[in-house]
């Protein structure tokens, strides 16, 4: 899609959040209405990207700045999310970043499953989220 914005916009869809419009908002740009992911949905989409495991520290840098996420929308998205990997990574990063909205989440309503995930072949095991992540991310402060 290339219009008068002097850029190419790549349209992508995902199904891991169920309802395709959950967490999607309308933004007006140059008198055009465009559907965009809310920050709450966008960070989950980043974690769902096929190459996300190679850039988890970069995604964590983004997570650190997401201080104003809406807990009710985050809760709804997490409950709708079908990817246990995405949910575990999101919750790990939110907790690690110390976001106040994290404390408002009802984690007992979020199904994290029981299987163990190895995001990276070598790294640090995070018992609470039953996953192995890169040492770089685990040790970042």
Predicted regions and their residues:
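Short gly/ser-rich loop at a beta-strand->alpha-helix junction or flexible surface loop bordering the NTP-binding
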Residues: 1-19
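Hydrophobic alpha-helical interaction segments
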Residues: 21-141
